[in-house]
Curated annotation (Swiss-Prot):
Cofactor annotation: Zn(2+)
Note accompanying the cofactor annotation: Binds 1 zinc ion per subunit.
Record EC number: 3.5.1.15
One Pfam family cited in the UniProt record for this chain: AstE_AspA_hybrid
Name of the protein in question: Probable aspartoacylase
GO molecular function, one term: hydrolase activity, acting on ester bonds
Keywords assigned by UniProt, alphabetized: Hydrolase, Metal-binding, Zinc
InterPro entries from the UniProt entry: AspA/AstE_fam (IPR050178), Aspartoacylase (IPR016708), AstE_AspA_cat (IPR055438), Aste_AspA_hybrid_dom (IPR007036)
Family: Belongs to the AspA/AstE family. Aspartoacylase subfamily.
Residues that hold substrate according to the record: 56, 63-64, 165, 276
Length: 293
């Protein structure tokens, strides 16, 4: 497998997620923290205007702007579309990138704990995910892609890499424990890559648990699009926990319970994520699987 020569640590893809932004600032002030012997690491603040205004984005979600067709479009670009083109020129181009690995740092208001999000099943991504989960037993691995549909996340610029997602944390703030937990995952990842480049890694052959994205679920709404129910208290904060048929899912404003009614159990994630209200997403449903790496 090809060695990694250039790695990017990206923060602030969403301008109100301060953990990644201030880690990038820290690494820029103390570059020795991310320096390794056999590959080059660079940092990037992805959405500086969003950060300045403490907004997730100015015009559109930057982490949905990396479709090849959009990157090649030069007509009337908004701010995030222009940033996506700049980032693609810096790290990419998508499909033939200058960088070999992208670490994209995120936070969530949902109770996701420590999560890494994979946008493909590249063998190297599975190996590093397996190693990280062995070092951090509470780490969850969420696979969020459809092999038949082009992924538009910043991580899709190159095959190797993943997003680190930590929570719960409010938008626009820092929280020391999650800051240092994120930094620890970054450091462990860099050490793993250094050892990989040196050929010093033991062969990894074990089962890991992944949470495979199935679909998103919207809030119950009127025909005019008004929300009429909230996440049920029994489900709130239970990300990565099993939701079985017949269990409470939503609670209406007149105190009526709406139950999960599909045939098979699921494991919801991003439950009640603040940034997803505008997207019509109350939660994402996943299937818990064990795979051999």
């Amino acid at each position: 497998m090809k060695k990694i020569n250039k790695l990017a640590i990206v923060g602030g893809t969403h301008g109100n997620e301060f953990t990644g932004i201030y880690l990038v600032k820290k690494f820029e002030e103390f570059p020795e923290l991310i320096s390794r012997r056999n590959f080059d690491t660079q940092t990037l603040l992805a959405n500086p205007q969003g950060f300045e205004l403490v907004k997730r984005y100015i015009d559109t979600d930057l982490n949905r702007c990396f479709k090849v067709e959009d990157l090649e479009n030069n007509t009337s670009l908004n701010y995030e579309e222009s940033r996506a083109k700049f980032i693609n020129q810096m790290l990419g181009p998508k499909g033939n990138p200058k960088f070999d690995f992208i670490l994209d740092l995120h936070t969530t208001t949902a109770n996701m704990g420590l999560t890494i999000i994979l946008v493909n099943y590249h063998p190297f991504n599975l190996k590093i995910a397996t190693y990280l989960s062995s070092v951090e037993p509470n780490l969850k691995i969420y696979t969020c892609f459809n092999p038949e549909v082009e992924n538009t996340f910043i991580n899709s610029i190159c095959e190797r890499g993943f997003a680190i997602e930590v929570g719960p944390i409010a938008q626009g703030i820092l929280q020391a424990d999650l800051f240092y937990k994120t930094e620890k995952l970054v450091q462990i990842s860099l050490d793993f890559i250094e050892h990989f480049n040196e050929g010093k890694l033991d062969h990894i052959n074990r089962d890991i648990v992944i949470y495979k994205h199935l679909k998103v679920v919207d809030y119950p709404k009127t025909k005019d699009g008004e929300i009429v129910a909230m996440i049920h208290p029994q489900l709130q904060g239970r990300d990565y926990q099993k939701l079985s048929p017949g269990e409470p899912m939503f609670l209406t404003f007149d105190n009526q319970t709406i139950y999960y009614q599909e045939e098979s159990p699921v494991w919801p994630v991003f439950i009640n994520e603040a940034a997803y209200y505008e997207k019509g997403i109350a939660m994402c449903l996943t299937k818990k699987e064990s795979i051999r790496v």
